[in-house]
């Protein structure tokens, strides 16, 4: 079986892939989508002996009947299941070691994510610190929008009479 340090780094890889793409994930359970991503990114899926379908079948085998996710222990069982198929000529232990080496230390790859373009006119139009006039009042120093408070002056209609506005200012006017 794998060494103790390999197991901890294997669990670390599990956690990284488990939280990928889900802001509410704790890292204790992995979805089928993230399991497939792990297998693809770590080159467990080679297209010949192990395909995406094989990965999905193994996921369904190791998870509970009504469960939609797998735990770290089930993840290790799933790797064991795939290791025999991925490395056919090796013994079970050697195949499991080899598949663990593929996964250990890997992180999810974010391919195809576009970066914002900050060139010429786009930079001037999107930089809120360069805004002038009433538009600069719409944003705070960090560039975050103020919402309706930045567009309109909000007056509270409070007081004894419906048309009396700006409650609490009468005393300031009388003292003059």
UniProtKB/Swiss-Prot annotation:
Comp. bias (Basic and acidic residues): 134-152
What's a Pfam family in this record? p25-alpha
Q: Does the keyword Cytoplasm apply?
A: yes
InterPro entries tied to this protein: EF-hand-dom_pair (IPR011992), TPP/p25 (IPR008907)
Keywords in alphabetical order, please. Cytoplasm, Cytoskeleton, Microtubule
Cellular component terms, GO, for this chain's entry? cytoplasm; microtubule
Matches recorded under Gene3D superfamilies: EF-hand (1.10.238.10)
Set out the biological process GO terms recorded for this chain's protein: microtubule bundle formation; microtubule polymerization
Do the record's keywords include Nucleus? no
- Per its UniProt record, what SUPFAM superfamilies does this chain match? EF-hand
A GO MF term: tubulin binding
Q: Where is this region: Disordered?
A: 126-152
- Where is this chain's protein located in or outside the cell? Cytoplasm; Cytoplasm, Cytoskeleton
Please report which protein family the annotation says this sequence is part of. Answer: Belongs to the TPPP family.
As for what it does, the entry says: Regulator of microtubule dynamic that has microtubule bundling activity.
What is this protein called in UniProt? Tubulin polymerization-promoting protein family member 3
Q: Which organism is it from?
A: Xenopus tropicalis
């Amino acid at each position: 079986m794998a060494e103790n340090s390999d197991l901890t780094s294997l669990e670390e890889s599990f956690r990284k892939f488990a939280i990928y793409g889900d802001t509410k994930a704790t890292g204790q359970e992995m979805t089928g989508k993230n399991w497939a991503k792990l297998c693809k990114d770590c080159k467990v899926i080679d297209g010949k002996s192990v395909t995406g379908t094989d990965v999905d079948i193994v996921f369904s085998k190791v998870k509970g009947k009504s469960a939609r996710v797998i735990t770290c222990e089930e993840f290790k069982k799933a790797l064991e299941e795939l290791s025999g198929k991925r490395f056919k000529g090796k013994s079970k232990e050697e195949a499991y070691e080899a598949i663990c080496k593929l996964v250990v230390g890997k992180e999810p790859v974010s391919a195809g994510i576009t970066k914002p373009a900050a060139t010429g006119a786009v930079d001037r139009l999107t930089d809120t610190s360069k805004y002038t006039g009433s538009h600069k009042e719409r944003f705070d120093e960090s560039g975050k929008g103020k919402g309706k408070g930045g567009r309109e002056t909000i007056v509270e209609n409070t007081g004894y009479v419906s048309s009396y506005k700006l409650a609490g200012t009468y005393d300031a006017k009388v003292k003059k």
